[in-house]
Amino acid sequence: MILRLFSYQRLFLAKGLFFSFLFLFIASFALADEFDDLFSDVETKEASPEKKSLWRDLLNNSNFKFTLRSMTQYENPSPRKGLDDKSQFVDGRLNYDTKLKRGMNLLSLAMWFEYGNQKDTYKGIGDFPEDRDDHRRIVEFNEFNWVGSWDNFDLTIGKKVFKMGISTLYSPSDRISPKDFNDPLNPKELGTWLSQIDVFKGDTTFTFAVIPFFTPLKRPPTNSRWSGTGESSNSIESLIPNNLPSSTSVEEFPDRTLENIQALLRVKTTVKGWDFFLAAFHGPNFFPVLAANSPINFRTEQVRVGNYSIGFSTTYKKFEFHGEALYQLAYASKDDNYLNYVFGSTLTMDKRVKRIGLEQIDLTAEFSKEKITAKQTHSDFVVSSEESRAARDIILTRIIFKYSENLRMAAGFNFDFDERGHFETAGFEYKMAPGLIFKMHTEFINGKKDTHYGQFRENDRLVTALEYSF
């Protein structure tokens, strides 16, 4: 009882700190306006700029987007206890973002309200400072940060989505911001709390960031159609050997200690039309591994690793070329050491296609491969993160047909050479009026049971969406 009371106190304290942080930021901008008024009569009267209103600027910089989505499943799933076996799912989301600029200070906020009829999927507001619950949040403060800008550097403090990679369809380096995989074919990028400094020198940017809290990936609930054979993808249960008569498991996350702080360093530059980046990361692994407490007792851990990545992009005539590679070094051999790389290109056709009534065609293709250089060998760990790493030997393609500013069609195809699984999608979007877009696409997934694509093979569906931006 005492422990429970203590945990509640910590929760209230954390949420109190968050809202205090919000209040102080807004109050500081408001007070800045008042101090301007205080010294107004000692300033030169030659210039009398219009007084800035904090609330008017927030409103003028506000953007809203409401999305209503419908998902119709083509087939019934295999029956199991508690399964959410509906064939029609609906959800709605209202996105809101705004910015406030005062001198060298920039305050940014991005959030959304979301709900749907998926069973056991939505719940409350995200936990502070890290959200370790798999539920999608009804209210999600995804980004809330302050940026201070000086002549040759920026300082960022707060919550934001951090993009690392450079590739178009798949980036092995994008492992900083957590992701919501409640719907694996429609994932969401989530913000993470960090302190970041960007130093600018000519065409080169040096970035150093510290991320004090670890937030894991969000996975589908066990009663979801997207949990495959009955357990969440990337969960402990999916990693436990099938030949055990019975077992128990616990899920462990990194403690809030200095040892588990995440840190990254990145250098981005442009040289004669070539964009490059080089990065190093230290912290808990993006993917979990399985450790054994006893022959029938298991736990997952996000073990500490070093990730070292490099990437490039350039253009030549109608072609864009890009590539990146990540090498993971698992400390104490608690996971695999491996190299994951991707190379790809986008071809843009905008002249000859006008003969067939099109404005433009964009064709993108990428190939991703993984090479394990050292297997997991630590005696306490029994399963590596290999099965959680989806892009080990895969080709990804996408083609976009632009008929006009109002109508676009697209198709995509992925094929996994390692597991012989595949994914196809095709659809269109039509701009019905300024700010109003109708979208429709279909998705087909297939592969052997217990493979990345195969676990979703009963989830072919038709997705329609109506988006209104204002």
For the regions a language model picked out, list residue spans one by one.
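N-terminal periplasmic/intermembrane-space "pro-region" immediately following the signal or transit peptide
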Residues: 30-103, 205
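Residues that define the transmembrane beta-barrel architecture of outer-membrane proteins
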Residues: 84-92, 137-142, 149, 188-193, ...
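Residue-level signature of outer-membrane beta-barrel architecture
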Residues: 94-102, 147-150, 159, 198-201, ...
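Transmembrane beta-barrel strands of outer-membrane/channel proteins
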Residues: 66-74, 109-115, 157-159, 208-212, ...
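Detector for outer-membrane/organellar transmembrane beta-barrel domains
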Residues: 281-283, 316-414
